[in-house]
Design a protein with these regions (language model features):
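Small-residue (primarily alanine) positions within well-ordered alpha-helices
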Residues: 12, 16-19, 29, 39, ...
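A short, polar/acidic, helix/strand-boundary loop motif
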Residues: 2, 45-46
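Short beta->alpha transition motifs characteristic of CBS
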Residues: 38-45
Length: 150
């Protein structure tokens, strides 16, 4: 793990905290190309009334618009929580090169925990995966958010 991985995960954590402040499930994401953040996002499913507006999806959409290409070759996606099946599929379609995530998602993590979509033999594209980056901080943001709602 490089120092830049920590830096970019901290940026994703900032996005997660923004989501929490807005009453959204606190997941944040940043998409990086050649060491530069090209998009940043947080969950906004409630705000936008859009079940697909997960942090990863929003970051991927914004990055594609920014660079003018649906293929995000050579990019790294930093996410505070392990992506779901929808988001893992979007990474494959967008050709994200690398996924770095914080904490595991026990109720639907589709990269390592519940499913391994990115490793499925039928998938014709491979995403490098690094997990556990700032995992405790990422998990704490989620735990604090849900503790306040119970």
């Amino acid at each position: 793990m490089a120092e830049s991985d920590l830096e970019f995960m901290r940026a994703a954590l900032d996005e997660a905290r923004t989501a929490a402040e807005r009453g959204e499930v606190p997941i944040g994401a940043v998409l990086v190309h050649e060491g530069i953040i090209i998009s940043r996002a947080h969950n906004c499913t409630l705000t936008d009334n859009d079940p697909t507006a997960h942090a990863e999806m929003v970051a991927i959409r914004e990055a594609a618009q920014t660079i003018g290409n649906h293929r995000l070759n050579g990019t790294s996606l930093y996410v505070t929580v392990e992506p779901c099946a929808m988001c893992a599929g979007a990474m494959i379609q967008a050709r994200v090169a690398r996924l770095v995530y914080g904490c595991a998602e026990q109720k639907g993590g589709a990269v390592r925990t519940c499913f391994q979509i990115l490793d499925h033999p039928a998938v014709n594209y491979r995403v490098e995966v690094i997990s556990g980056v700032l995992a405790q901080e990422c998990a704490a943001v989620m735990q604090d958010f849900f503790a306040q709602r119970r």
